[in-house]
A protein has these predicted regions:
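Phosphate/nucleotide-binding beta-alpha loop and adjacent structural elements of enzyme active sites
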Residues: 1-209
Length: 209
């Protein structure tokens, strides 16, 4: 997390977290520290699942799923990056190559994509148990948000990776994410950007809608 003091901006109690783009679950201690009672982890890269499972296996009400989240239902090629998978993405590299020339894609992995609203419907879980969404999917963050459909109204906080130029080809820019979330009364309250034009932002729901 780039925003290390994120908890200062959480003005409502956090119940559960939905974490899309889990990687190896490095944020699990933060969730434990700040009282999240449940965490759903989604990671499409099968190579990372054993590490993720080992990290969260003894944590109560932490579950992981080896699927990708998107607003379309299909199979797709996940481009696996050479930095232990951290920069893996469904999208081709854009200006990321300029700022991180050492990072490249080394192979593809066919993954299954599903929508978050569909996941909650077929899994029988209640999305009302989760009011915090963490999205780190290297360029397809807006697709993840759209996959919630109207269920996005159940959330209080959205913590997302953002970019202000095309770090990945055809990625959504922060202005597009701002505009989409504004439809549901989410306002960006804090942003931390890097010199490479990507960063993190916290969106908080203002009032009721």
């Amino acid at each position: 997390m780039l925003i290390t003091d994120l908890h200062k901006y959480l003005d409502k109690p956090c119940r559960g977290a939905i974490h899309v783009g889990a990687n190896i679950g490095e944020e699990c201690e933060w969730y434990q520290q700040y009282g999240f009672t449940k965490v759903l982890w989604f990671e499409p890269n099968v190579e990372l699942i054993p590490i993720l499972e080992k990290r969260i296996c003894e944590l109560k009400n932490n579950e992981f799923f080896n699927i990708g989240i998107h607003d379309t239902l299909k199979k797709a090629n996940l481009h696996i990056a050479n930095n232990e998978g951290q920069s893996s993405s469904l999208l081709a590299l854009g200006t990321h190559k300029k700022y991180h020339p050492q990072v490249r894609y080394v192979r593809d992995q066919v993954i299954r994509l599903t929508r978050l609203d569909d996941f909650f419907e077929y899994s029988g879980r209640d999305i009302s148990d989760y009011n915090f969404l963490n999205v780190d999917v290297e360029g397809t963050e807006l697709n993840v948000l759209k996959s919630l459909g109207d269920s996005i109204r159940k959330l209080d906080y959205i913590y997302s990776e953002v970019c202000d130029e095309y770090v990945r080809k055809e990625c959504a820019l922060i202005s597009e994410i701002d505009a989409y979330l504004n439809n549901f009364n989410f306002k960006r309250v804090v942003t931390k950007m890097t010199k490479a034009h990507w960063g993190d932002a916290l969106y908080r729901k203002e009032g009721k809608l």
